[in-house]
Amino acid sequence: MSVIETATVPLAQQQADALLNVKDLRVTFSTPDGDVTAVNDLNFSLRAGETLGIVGESGSGKSQTAFALMGLLAANGRIGGSATFNGREILNLPEHELNKLRAEQISMIFQDPMTSLNPYMRVGEQLMEVLMLHKNMSKAEAFEESVRMLDAVKMPEARKRMKMYPHEFSGGMRQRVMIAMALLCRPKLLIADEPTTALDVTVQAQIMTLLNELKREFNTAIIMITHDLVVVAGICDKVLVMYAGRTMEYGNARDVFYQPVHPYSIGLLNAVPRLDAEGETMLTIPGNPPNLLRLPKGCPFQPRCPHAMEICSSAPPLEEFTPGRLRACFKPVEELL
């Protein structure tokens, strides 16, 4: 197979008209055993209406990237680099400005909706509170708008559900409530941190379809954090593959999914269970993700990589090898396709 020939927008042009521009993002935590770098010089951009999938194993830095953008890092965390949203720097904003930004411009959906909803308040009260606080709506206006948003996320009998408590909903319905709450203020950016992890496969598909529909309806940019590459194929426009806090590969979702050019991306895809592989042994990536306190020299994936070479003891640069596509690997692209 030849080197990929895809009409992809060069990175410089993507950054020029981006809603969100992240440059050299670095997240470090102070621990008794030393500093841990959870995110290491991350770069990406996102335009209005686009979906970026951030993919990787546990501990790769996916969630910490989101928490850094939202200003939700733990007390021992430090941020470096730059993140501009609508041309405005958002890292290290004062708390009152962050609260306004999080309420009106950027929203986040967390993994477990049950722990995100107040079990002592009716769902309707929690939705209405957002609108009354941030949109200065009256109680009656907030009620009707909340019902409309529950309808938008395909909640059956939305008006009736407003009077129910979180424990009366199924997992999928609770996640629909969280999506509705996140979209009430019509944010320009929605960050979804593993939003389907606790759901069964059928409900996962429904939530992914719903997010796709809402993205088109509201022209919302989405950052989808996941370890599931099937999710990436179904909803994302671009993909960032992370390992040990670093970018391994970045590009158009279709290209990364069908023609990955980094051994780690290839390993993740090979590990996805297939319905047509009956009787075959499931492939895995050997070894374990590295200890971030004691990273291997050079490429962090080197100890687990089937293509490791002597040169991999040096850190490979992240290079744009074709317009809009990045990778950090010394192995020639042609030998991986």
From Swiss-Prot:
Keywords: ATP-binding, Cell inner membrane, Cell membrane, Membrane, Nucleotide-binding, Peptide transport, Protein transport, Translocase, Transport. ATP binds at residues 56-63. GO terms for cellular component: ATP-binding cassette (ABC) transporter complex, substrate-binding subunit-containing; membrane. Belongs to the ABC transporter superfamily. Residues 20-269 form the ABC transporter domain. InterPro entries: AAA+_ATPase (IPR003593), ABC_Ni/Peptide_Import (IPR050388), ABC_transporter-like_ATP-bd (IPR003439), ABC_transporter-like_CS (IPR017871), Oligopep_ABC_C (IPR013563), P-loop_NTPase (IPR027417). One of its GO terms (molecular function) is ATP binding. Its EC number is 7.4.2.6. It is found in: Cell inner membrane. The complex is composed of two ATP-binding proteins (OppD and OppF), two transmembrane proteins (OppB and OppC) and a solute-binding protein (OppA or MppA). It is a peripheral membrane protein. This is Oligopeptide transport ATP-binding protein OppD. Part of the ABC transporter complex OppABCDF involved in the uptake of oligopeptides and of the ABC transporter complex MppA-OppBCDF involved in the uptake of the cell wall murein tripeptide L-alanyl-gamma-D-glutamyl-meso-diaminopimelate. Probably responsible for energy coupling to the transport system. Plays an important nutritional role and is involved in the recycling of cell wall peptides. GO terms for biological process: oligopeptide import across plasma membrane; peptidoglycan-associated peptide transport; protein transport; tripeptide import across plasma membrane. It comes from Escherichia coli (strain K12).
